[in-house]
Structures are given as C-alpha cells and as structure tokens.
Amino acid sequence: MTLTASSSSRAVTNSPVVVALDYHNRDDALSFVDKIDPRDCRLKVGKEMFTLFGPQFVRELQQRGFDIFLDLKFHDIPNTAAHAVAAAADLGVWMVNVHASGGARMMTAAREALVPYGKDAPLLIAVTVLTSMEASDLADLGVTLSPADYAERLAALTQKCGFDGVVCSAQEAVRFKQVFGQEFKLVTPGIRPQGSDAGDQRRIMTPEQALAAGVDYMVIGRPVTQSVDPAQTLKAINASLQRSA
C-alpha cells in the first residue's frame, strides 16, 4: 500500500494514523491535542465527546489544524440519516460514518445528501462488524455467519451504495482489497503497536501488519493518548510505517 493523502481538499497529512480522542474531560483532551502535530495524524471524535462537548469542540480541533473523523455511526431512517450526514459535512469534517446494517435505502440517502458538497464532501464510510464482536455475539443477534463473512456481506452492500469505504477489522483487509479494489478505503480500529494491551478490542493488529494488509486509515487510541510522550510515539509509528511501505 502507498501512503497517500485523502482526496479531501482539507487534508493536512498523509499519515494513515487516526488518533481516537476518548476523554471524559474537554480540557484533558485539548491538553493532549496541544502536544501533537496535525501533520502526524488525524483525530477521531466519537459519541461520548461529541455528546458532552458538541460541534464547538470539533471546531476547536479544526482550528488547531486537525482533520476530524466524526465517528457517530448514524443508524436511523433514511431521511434522518441523510440530514445527519449533511450536518457533518456542514461542520467541515474529513470523514463521517453510518452503520451498514441500516440498509441500502439509508446508505443511499446518506450518499445523496453529500452530492451538493462536491469535492468538499467528507469521506463517507460504513461500519460493518464492530471489532469488539465475536461469532458468539453475532449468534446472539441471529446472525449465523462468521464476523468476517458478515462484514464482507455488509461491505459489498456499502460499495453498491457508492460509499468511499468501510470500517473493518485488519484481518478482513486483505480479502476486502482483493474483492472491492484498491480505491475502496478501509478504516480499521484495534490497531496497537507491539507490546500494547489489547483493551476492549478483540481483533487487533500492529500498525505495520495493518499497512501490509491494505488498511488505509488505522485508528489508534490509548497507546498514543496515554503515552508519556505522545508526539514521539506518533513520530515513531509513522517512521515504522514509512519503513514498511
């Protein structure tokens, strides 16, 4: 895989690293952000922080120069999902996502909502199977497919609906690149440098392994946010990825 910048005109980095900002406190989050360089990563804002601090928090991160992945995983009736995705585009985020399990009509409505934004539209990504889920979790929901097979089915639907890519586990990346092509972007949580604790992720991989597997954007949280020197940790990860590319 070649390390390339996003097609978004807002992109300020060609690093595939997206740091997950999982903080309970706004000041703690901004204190961390002020220690790192927007040229070394993008930032992911999820449900907790967005619910606590709202769009203004996203704007504060953007004012510091960061591209933002708004990880709210919209899953609703088509009209509501479309309006939510358009609101994310109005906020100027770099990437936004929905749940593929919302179905084709919901995903098509979301994609169509971004057409007026042209080249300024955020990347539109769908979540397939959460990386915390195992086969037993899917069985509880009445899904008899393995996590990998179910994720591939949802990814195929996502591509059919015209999305830019999917969130998937790194283990699915090789297969997905073969099936869906190089332009279909793969966003992968559960990426942890060698020696990091697995935390609540079940299907994990190192950054170097993820790059080799074809992952386009790798989400890394606590190994960076809890690092004594997060700026150096990011530089070390990016350097290792450049060596592996």
UniProtKB/Swiss-Prot annotation:
InterPro entries to which the protein is assigned, alphabetical: Aldolase_TIM (IPR013785), OMPdecase (IPR014732), OMPdecase_AS (IPR018089), OMPdecase_bac (IPR047596), OMPdeCOase_dom (IPR001754), RibuloseP-bd_barrel (IPR011060)
Record's keyword terms, sorted: Decarboxylase, Lyase, Pyrimidine biosynthesis
Provide the reaction this enzyme catalyses: orotidine 5'-phosphate + H(+) = UMP + CO2
Q: Where is the active site?
A: K73
A Gene Ontology biological process noted in the UniProt record is: 'de novo' UMP biosynthetic process
GO CC annotation: cytosol
Which residues are noted in the entry as substrate-binding?
A: 22, 44, 71-80, 131, 192, 201, 221-222
Q: What class of enzyme is it?
A: lyase
Q: What is its EC number?
A: 4.1.1.23
Superkingdom of origin: Bacteria
Q: Which family does it belong to?
A: Belongs to the OMP decarboxylase family. Type 1 subfamily.
The record's HAMAP family line, in alphabetical order, gives: OMPdecase_type1_B (MF_01200_B)
The subunit structure is: Homodimer.
Q: What is this protein called?
A: Orotidine 5'-phosphate decarboxylase
Give the organism the record lists: Shigella dysenteriae serotype 1 (strain Sd197)
Gene field: pyrF
